[in-house]
Amino acid sequence: MTESLLYSGKAKNMFQTDDPEIVHIHYKDQATALNGKVKEKIEGKGQLTSHISALLFNYLTVQGIENHFQKELENGDALVRKVKIVPLEVVTRNFAAGHFASRFNVPMHKALKPAVHEFYFKSDSLDDPFINNEQILALEIADKKTISQMKEEAELINQKLINLFDQIGITLIDFKVEFGFTSQGKLLLADELSPDNMRLLDKESGKSLDKDVFRQKIGDVRIGYQTVLDRLNNKLIAGEN
């Protein structure tokens, strides 16, 4: 099987397979911060990210949320459906953190009810700026139907993930998702689902189990990722037996 590189990003490489509708993803052993301005090689992180993402995509599939994930390969890589990504990040916030907390001068981890959904324009050169519905429409990035569908899907995903993480002793602070269109014009959840793009706190200790550990330089990011993976495995895999 011959593959050609489609995309090389901060966290993953994507290759075109012999099937025009299927893409091969390889997750890098790398952590980044400040939109890629800070990066560090971390051995084994790629497989942790891939395993967690596979478990969460499969869980959401069972929950009725369609996504691009197809299968995880033996080497820890993944096969996904090829989509044309909408250049928008959808960030869902259940508790104040990061830029939201500083922007509005609210206490860290203040509960947000209802959950806040925000759009950010995908542009490394512009540092992924916040963008509102009217700006999205004016710049012809997406139409009203797509904007509405993405927000509705983000809310559904939020409820499903809150429920899952609550059962394994983890609080879902916030997360980022992306969506893309298949060649048939169907909008699917895409990209990845891992502690790289969500904030997770251990309910008992209050410790971060996500990339904030790397951003804030407070330890080995793999420890938190492994904790998340172990708990998801125990719940979703071992729990089935």
Curated annotation (Swiss-Prot):
Its EC number is 6.3.2.6. Keywords: ATP-binding, Ligase, Nucleotide-binding, Purine biosynthesis. InterPro entries: SAICAR_synt/ADE2_N, SAICAR_synt_PurC, SAICAR_synth, SAICAR_synthetase. One of its GO terms (biological process) is cobalamin biosynthetic process. One of its GO terms (molecular function) is phosphoribosylaminoimidazolesuccinocarboxamide synthase activity. It catalyses: 5-amino-1-(5-phospho-D-ribosyl)imidazole-4-carboxylate + L-aspartate + ATP = (2S)-2-[5-amino-1-(5-phospho-beta-D-ribosyl)imidazole-4-carboxamido]succinate + ADP + phosphate + 2 H(+). It holds the Pfam family SAICAR_synt. It is an enzyme of class 6 (ligase). It comes from the Bacteria. Pathway: Purine metabolism; IMP biosynthesis via de novo pathway; 5-amino-1-(5-phospho-D-ribosyl)imidazole-4-carboxamide from 5-amino-1-(5-phospho-D-ribosyl)imidazole-4-carboxylate: step 1/2. NCBIfam families: purC (TIGR00081). Belongs to the SAICAR synthetase family. This is Phosphoribosylaminoimidazole-succinocarboxamide synthase. The lineage of its organism: Bacteria, Bacillati, Bacillota, Bacilli, Lactobacillales.
